[in-house]
């Protein structure tokens, strides 16, 4: 499994780096306090689209502190994350964050107790404030208990000592309150998404849907109802019903097929080298059912990262925003703007 993931990651990164000739990145910074920063940093270093991280102390009383003074200075152990929003959305970053914290615990995460171990989301870019607030509001609907994560502008961030930077890289097996294996698993529960048998698919899918998803056929350009489609919602795999793309990332490429700048989450798709028809391309598949979707090219909008996911409409099913909750896609509403 690890070998497969490495090959997929290698194909993706080679493709993406090729699209980055003019540095078409959209870098953003977020500061996350989630208990002991050793484990939190190690977790986010595994997430695709995270460019770099460092650990420090945030939102204390002054611009000076150190590890041994946190009890007095009021700072929280915090991970500074720089991510490329053209690869991974802030919503996905925050979904990962909530995955590894207890959002109701006050001044305690894992075995660590004290105000320095409180949870917090801090920002130095006011344009992120509304997105963070919307995410928290959406997350709160899942619980009766009030979320205890503080959301504030960043202040008095102090870089931690070298000893703490990449601590678990330097000390494998060191103390960690975070289950790092979660970073290699699907972000959301996929138990409700199934890959039917070939016989079931032949009975459920149209001839075109079957030939595209199972036999790697290509629909005629300009033939899909989704080509010029611009309603808000998500596009799911016609086979497994797993979410693949958001309408927020859809654009009209003029090529005759539905086009997107990125998948809805970084774990939604698979990538394969395709040498068919005398060309070298990157095939895009659904990660769960391995349905053929189309290909990804490096001629997309530069301000969105330069990628164009050229997708057969026959491989997709659209779920309108207003129907997402009743159809079982509540977790994904936050990805639709």
From Swiss-Prot:
GO biological process terms held by the UniProt record: protein modification process; protein repair; response to oxidative stress
This entry carries the following GO cellular component terms, namely: cytoplasm
Q: Which reaction does it catalyse?
A: L-methionyl-[protein] + [thioredoxin]-disulfide + H2O = L-methionyl-(S)-S-oxide-[protein] + [thioredoxin]-dithiol; [thioredoxin]-disulfide + L-methionine + H2O = L-methionine (S)-S-oxide + [thioredoxin]-dithiol; L-methionyl-[protein] + [thioredoxin]-disulfide + H2O = L-methionyl-(R)-S-oxide-[protein] + [thioredoxin]-dithiol
* Domain of life of the native organism: Bacteria
* Broadest EC class assigned to this enzyme: oxidoreductase
Q: Spell out the residue ranges making up region: Peptide methionine sulfoxide reductase A.
A: 28-181
| Active site positions | 36, 310
Q: Which InterPro entries match?
A: Met_Sox_Rdtase_MsrA_dom, Met_Sox_Rdtase_MsrA_sf, Met_Sox_Rdtase_MsrB, Met_Sox_Rdtase_MsrB_dom, Mss4-like_sf
Q: Where is the MsrB domain?
A: 198-321
Question: What keywords were assigned to this record?
Answer: Multifunctional enzyme, Oxidoreductase
GO molecular function terms here? Answer: L-methionine:thioredoxin-disulfide S-oxidoreductase activity; peptide-methionine (R)-S-oxide reductase activity; peptide-methionine (S)-S-oxide reductase activity
Mention any Pfam family matching this sequence: PMSR
| EC number(s) reported in the record | 1.8.4.11, 1.8.4.12
**In which family does this protein belong, per the annotation?**
In the N-terminal section; belongs to the MsrA Met sulfoxide reductase family. In the C-terminal section; belongs to the MsrB Met sulfoxide reductase family.
| PANTHER family xref list | METHIONINE SULFOXIDE REDUCTASE, METHIONINE-R-SULFOXIDE REDUCTASE B1
The record describes the protein's role as: Has an important function as a repair enzyme for proteins that have been inactivated by oxidation. Catalyzes the reversible oxidation-reduction of methionine sulfoxide in proteins to methionine.
Protein name listed in UniProt:
Peptide methionine sulfoxide reductase MsrA/MsrB
